[in-house]
A protein has these predicted regions:
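Post-transcriptional modification and biogenesis factors for structured RNAs
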Residues: 1-199
Length: 199
């Protein structure tokens, strides 16, 4: 919110000084069907921005779907990577169109902090399956890995309909992922660790 304008109305992703969550709705209930009667009656302690307080899950997803960006995010999960939940949460924060998990179907949802409920998630058994989906959807695969020859992300000209493909902690993107990608971008790092949490 613009602190220089005391009359400014906060946007959907701006926070107030209030505690996390709100109590039961005070006064007459709104009649709009996007509101959830249980939340109106009992209060809403979910980790959602204030604009979505008391809304049903389906109403929130429908509203997000009107505004999602064109890019997709994918992460390989051949070794049961523990970072996938964080990737899902970050994809939600940046309003990615979809998240794709490649490899094992099971993943650790803890890091997602229930944002997986608001994010479209698709599973692919192999990188080849992901590449086939990308071709059909008109998406350009861009691998993200700190490898020789990669283009620094801050200098790259990414296609609007990009599918950002992250590898796993440790091995990075697989050879199959490198071959499926049109380009590989790196994320600049200045500390001692070789990799960062993809989320």
């Amino acid at each position: 919110m613009d602190s220089s304008n005391p009359n400014a109305v906060p946007g959907p992703t701006e926070w107030t000084e209030a505690r996390h969550g709100v109590g039961p709705w005070e006064g007459e209930w709104p009649s709009n069907p996007r509101y959830d009667e249980t939340l109106l009656r009992e209060g809403d302690t979910r980790n959602v921005v204030d604009a979505y307080r008391y809304w049903s899950l389906d109403a929130i997803v429908a509203d997000l779907d009107k505004r999602r960006h064109d890019f997709h995010v994918a992460i390989e999960n051949f070794e049961h990577d523990m970072n996938i939940g964080t990737v899902v949460r970050t994809a939600n924060a940046f309003l990615a169109k979809e998240v794709h998990i490649v490899g094992k179907k099971r993943w650790n949802r803890r890091g997602a902090m229930v944002t997986d409920r608001y994010q479209h998630i698709r599973h692919h058994k192999t990188v080849a399956d992901l590449a086939e989906f990308a071709r059909g959807a008109g998406l350009t695969i861009v691998a993200i890995d700190n490898t020789p020859g990669s283009v620094p992300l801050e200098a790259a000209k990414l296609p609007k309909r990009a599918l950002l493909l992250f590898g796993q902690e440790g091995p990075g993107v697989t050879d199959d992922a490198q071959r499926a990608a049109t380009m590989t971008c790196s994320i600049a790092q200045f500390g001692s660790t070789r990799s960062i949490n993809a989320g």
